[in-house]
């Protein structure tokens, strides 16, 4: 078996020209695509419709290529669009394919394994609560099974797309006599991301016990070092992509992870590379970098290594947007590449002010 990752630069949220060219050249086989991750150039907030624009464009594109309707495409491909390319970050897509028929060229080295799973649609009153934690946990376990990953320690990154609350959704719940986790629609993004991340932590055995509603977005000592969740208005379910290394998968692509302890922790790249099977023999160059995924969030302390920051005090630009620009610049400077999947909002995803980082390399 083999997972292939193709990184494509895009000119706009509806730009499928690079993807079409990759398919025409044989670089990408649309029948094997299981997920498309994308950084779009919106604000990453509630009213960022670049995510929905890109998702609807991609669904229509694959429906035409696969001779399916969009509902059928929705059942086989996870579309995870993360808004916000602040600073020098470059909008791009990461296309994940799985070829079940490809034999591994090296049976001694585990290779990149990928699997997807979806929850059912969440009701508004379930977003940001234990129901979302439990549904996510179950979906992560199903995605692991789809990837053939048997040990939780072989999972290096779990990327999730999750829903958020809108005024209409809050009112719909109230009409049925149901309460919601919060009434601020932007704040609901954090609750959804946090509950999703805790679902990953529960699936991977990183929690001391069951999660309670009152712990979500409050008890920050609970977190996953391998979860990345991105909230959006364009869906009602959680879409889960599990990435790890497993025997029997071709090792041309491999993954490793580490945790950025703060926004300046560029050394996390080296630690992530060290966790890649055979990573000590890999010299990381732009050609070998298949993808980088990382979470970013302003530290709640208001400082970075003892120096004050004002990311959380800016009334014009949300703090997560500042954090994406900062972390993106730190990592791009190390890698010489701005096509990095830097996602803001790291509730229960790594330590305060830091976040999980995953590195996909090509041998």
Swiss-Prot record:
Q: Where is this site: Important for substrate specificity?
A: 320
What are the EC numbers?
3.5.2.15
Enumerate the residue ranges of region (RU C). Answer: 253-363
Domain of life of the organism in this record? Bacteria
Stretch list, region RU B: 111-247
Q: What modulates its activity?
A: Inhibited by barbituric acid.
Name the InterPro entries for this protein: AtzD/Barbiturase, AtzD/Barbiturase_RUA, AtzD/Barbiturase_RUB, AtzD/Barbiturase_RUC
Record GO biological process: atrazine catabolic process
Q: Where is this region: RU A?
A: 1-103
What the entry lists under NCBIfam families is as follows: amido_AtzD_TrzD
Summarize the subunit comment: Homotetramer.
Family note: Belongs to the cyclic amide hydrolase (CyAH) family.
Please give the name of this protein: Cyanuric acid amidohydrolase
């Amino acid at each position: 078996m083999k997972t292939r990752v193709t990184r494509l630069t895009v000119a706009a949220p509806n730009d499928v020209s690079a993807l079409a060219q990759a398919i025409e050249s044989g670089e990408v086989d649309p029948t094997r695509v299981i997920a498309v991750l994308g950084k779009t150039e919106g604000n990453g907030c509630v009213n960022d419709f670049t995510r929905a624009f890109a998702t609807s464009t991609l669904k229509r594109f694959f429906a035409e290529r696969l001779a399916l309707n969009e509902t059928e495409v929705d059942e086989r491909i996870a579309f995870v669009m993360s808004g916000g390319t602040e600073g020098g970050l470059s909008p791009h897509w990461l296309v994940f394919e799985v070829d079940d028929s490809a034999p591994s060229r090296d049976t001694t080295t585990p290779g990149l394994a990928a699997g997807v799973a979806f929850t059912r649609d969440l009701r508004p009153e379930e977003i940001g609560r234990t129901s979302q934690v439990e549904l996510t946990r179950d979906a992560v376990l199903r995605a692991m099974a789809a990837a053939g990953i048997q040990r939780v320690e072989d999972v290096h990154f779990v990327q999730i797309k999750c829903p958020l609350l809108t005024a209409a959704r809050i009112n719909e719940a109230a009409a049925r006599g149901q309460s919601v986790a919060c009434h601020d629609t932007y704040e609901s993004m954090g609750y959804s991301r946090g509950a999703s991340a805790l679902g990953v932590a529960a699936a991977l055995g990183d929690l001391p016990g069951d999660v309670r509603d009152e712990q979500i977005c409050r008890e920050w000592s609970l977190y996953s070092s391998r979860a990345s969740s991105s909230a959006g208005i364009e869906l009602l379910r959680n879409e889960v992509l599990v990435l790890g290394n497993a025997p029997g998968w071709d090792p041309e692509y491999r993954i490793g992870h580490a945790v950025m302890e703060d926004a300046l922790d560029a050394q996390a790249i080296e630690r992530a590379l060290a966790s890649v099977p055979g990573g000590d023999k890999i010299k990381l160059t732009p050609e070998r970098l298949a993808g980088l995924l990382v979470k970013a969030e302003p530290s709640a302390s208001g400082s970075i290594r003892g120096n004050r920051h004002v990311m959380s005090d800016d009334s014009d630009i949300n703090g997560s947007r500042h954090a994406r620009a900062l972390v993106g610049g730190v990592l791009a400077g190390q890698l010489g590449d701005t096509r990095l999947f830097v996602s803001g909002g790291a509730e229960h995803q790594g330590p305060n002010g830091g976040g999980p980082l995953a590195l996909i390399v090509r041998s």
